[in-house]
Amino acid sequence: METVRDRSGTRYLLVKRSAESSRVRDPRTGEERYVRNDDLEPSDESALLAAGRATPTAVREDPDLRGVGDERTLGLLREIARREPVGVLTLLDSYDLCESDLHGSLAELRAAGLIEPADLDGITLADDRGYRTTERTRAAFDATRQDG
């Protein structure tokens, strides 16, 4: 996944590019919309870093999530929450992490009790390992959605 900017400088995550327009997602709100390609330019920021930086303060300050080590890992947690259950191969294909960095971040999130293994039967390849967020992680993200 790439990041792009519109003419006003607002950053988006590029979901899908077509011939004349692209579907983009606002990393703060998760809202998706189409924007003309002529109105977008590439951004050099990592998609996971952008997602992490866009995490609401209320989520960052949640006692259960405070232990996340850095913004990129927080972005990974948000993306897992958005796409769950999601396979490791899908994450490797979608984001700018090498296998070693991804597994390190997943191990950190697992050790903190923020993600757990998930069954991917029928979703991806049979030998792909999957993850989903834990109940306490979902509760932290849901609380901010309900607050506005």
Language-model features, listed with the residues they occupy:
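Short, amphipathic alpha-helical interaction segments positioned at domain boundaries
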Residues: 129-148
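Short acidic, hydrophobic short linear motifs in intrinsically disordered regions
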Residues: 83-95
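Short amphipathic alpha-helical elements of helix-turn-helix/winged-helix folds
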Residues: 75-83
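Terminal disorder- and signal-encoded targeting elements
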Residues: 1, 120, 144-148
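Short acidic/glycine-enriched loop/turn segments that link adjacent beta-strands
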Residues: 19-20, 124-127
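Short alpha-helical segments that sit at the start of domains
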Residues: 50-76
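DNA-contacting interfaces and partner/effector-binding or oligomerization modules
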Residues: 1-57
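Short amphipathic alpha-helical interaction segments
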Residues: 96-112, 117, 128
